[in-house]
UniProtKB/Swiss-Prot annotation:
GO terms for cellular component: Gram-negative-bacterium-type cell wall; plasma membrane. It is found in: Cell inner membrane. This is Na(+)-translocating NADH-quinone reductase subunit E. It is a multi-pass membrane protein. NQR complex catalyzes the reduction of ubiquinone-1 to ubiquinol by two successive reactions, coupled with the transport of Na(+) ions from the cytoplasm to the periplasm. NqrA to NqrE are probably involved in the second step, the conversion of ubisemiquinone to ubiquinol. It comes from the Bacteria.
Amino acid sequence: MEHYLSLFIKSVFIENMALSFFLGMCTFLAVSKKVSTAFGLGVAVIFVLGLSVPVNQLVYSLLKDGAIVEGVDLTFLKFITFIGVIAALVQILEMFLDKFVPALYNALGIYLPLITVNCAIFGAVSFMAQREYNFGESVVYGFGAGLGWMLAIVALAGITEKMKYSDAPKGLKGLGITFIAAGLMAMAFMSFSGIQL
């Protein structure tokens, strides 16, 4: 149990996808203008990561040498299968949001289908395969990585909303000051890197 708790804390804070590995930055910066939209996208990322990492772990275990047929190694198919599973889960999420939460679906716009090619999603799945997590570890890691990404984007959206009323220099208004805020947040999250769990 302690191992899973440390893996969860590590995936949320120490190895934060957005602020430590700088993965998923296109949607991270583009959708961080309003807290409500950032929260909705964060929940969507938690859903996709929380499902795609464990599902891809099961698929990857079938691709390993001798898993299906003795002497047959299908690990060269891992990237294409990972992308297929992620795309299917994002499509299911998109249909669900369109049907039941149309306001969030419209607010996310093009960024919802872009979760399919979000490097934070693929990065978490690749880390799972590289680190050879078992199914339980992949569930904890996927949920923790999604929660960490959501924490980062909601925090940045809150800062961005407050900065609308600040007197920023003309050349830094908009994306410029957002980059500076994201960089300062990343520096703050680097303080967690010295923690050994």
